[in-house]
Amino acid sequence: MTHIPKTPADTETLLSEVQGWKHRHVLDLDNFSREELDMVMQTAGVMLDILSRPVKKVPALKGKTIATLFYEPSTRTRSSFELAAKSLSADVLNLNVSQSSISKGESLLDTLDTLESLGADMVVMRHPLSGAPYLAANNCHANIINAGDGWHAHPSQALLDIFTILRHKSSLEGLKITLIGDIKHSRVAHSNIWGLSKMGAKITLCAPYTLLPEGLNTNSKIFPEVTLETDIKQAVSGADVVMGLRLQRERQQSGLLPGIREYARYFQLNEEILKLAKPNSLVMHPGPVNEDIELSQSVVHGEQSVINEQVKNGVAVRMALFYLCSGSKEI
């Protein structure tokens, strides 16, 4: 069972435990141990306590500079990382890609060299190409935090999803967690499969055949607790958590879907389908939600929805990642 600290008294214990953190970068969750995932959850619990105070700021990263480098549009993730950095008293260097030398053809590595020359200790980056953060991590001294790369990974989103579930459930062991949507092209799904599996959850992936990942089935040695399903009723039945994923409209243009409305007819999570899940089940979505396509409006704003809570918890989890990767010994 993962213990999430909820009182200031737990902070001293936390500080003595996090010294074993070994990751300089956060690129995905495939190389995280269960113990390291627990450490992130525990640290995020302390950060959430900080965010509940009248003064939502501590000097843990005072004097550090964190740069944000987003090659793709982002509102929630970028704002969340910036607020997390400022809550730890770090200076934030926000690079506007469209108005920088990048728009003139500057390479990723040259841009990173520039950021390091400007004093960046950490770089939060989002890139359309899968693997770009790994290239960055192998070629610069700053800590790299992956805020999403292509179809590959979005580790901080998966971590905040796990943290949000643990705020409502004592453990993820044995929970049925159902993900519905474009699994094949979702970096959120990919990181969640790693993280949720390591936390002991049983995962059901639900989508049309064309949007399910190839080569991932119940015979997988890596993910033995993952089930693929094309029937949403079967997928949601008995679920403890149901997570919708954004349907990327460009998939329809590539011929993988006959139409958005056709998708909604068979795979939308609405009130009728949600009744098949456990009565105390949670409804989640990484956002932005295409209402009445992935989730019905009533489900998005219903009592079981923790979507807004995910946004709030994201700041605490990203504070935890900054804190752990920095090697700071103070809060």
Swiss-Prot record:
GO cellular component terms, A-Z? cytosol
- List S-S links within the chain: none
Q: Which Gene3D superfamilies match?
A: Aspartate/ornithine carbamoyltransferase
Instruction: List, alphabetically, the Pfam families matched.
Output: OTCace, OTCace_N
- List the HAMAP family: Asp_carb_tr (MF_00001)
UniProt keyword annotation of Secreted present: no
| EC number(s) recorded for this UniProt protein | 2.1.3.2
Oligomeric state and partners?
Heterododecamer (2C3:3R2) of six catalytic PyrB chains organized as two trimers (C3), and six regulatory PyrI chains organized as three dimers (R2).
Q: Which GO terms describe its biological process?
A: 'de novo' pyrimidine nucleobase biosynthetic process; 'de novo' UMP biosynthetic process; amino acid metabolic process
Q: Which residues bind L-aspartate?
A: K104, R187, R246
Enumerate the residues binding carbamoyl phosphate. R76, T77, R126, H154, Q157, G287, P288
Its biological purpose: Catalyzes the condensation of carbamoyl phosphate and aspartate to form carbamoyl aspartate and inorganic phosphate, the committed step in the de novo pyrimidine nucleotide biosynthesis pathway.
Task: Enumerate the UniProt keywords alphabetically.
Answer: Pyrimidine biosynthesis, Transferase
Q: In which pathway does it act?
A: Pyrimidine metabolism; UMP biosynthesis via de novo pathway; (S)-dihydroorotate from bicarbonate: step 2/3
Q: Which reaction does it catalyse?
A: carbamoyl phosphate + L-aspartate = N-carbamoyl-L-aspartate + phosphate + H(+)
Question: Which family does the entry's similarity section mention?
Answer: Belongs to the aspartate/ornithine carbamoyltransferase superfamily. ATCase family.
Please give the Gene Ontology molecular function terms for this protein: amino acid binding; aspartate carbamoyltransferase activity
Protein name in the entry: Aspartate carbamoyltransferase catalytic subunit
**Gene that codes for this?**
pyrB
The main enzyme category here is transferase
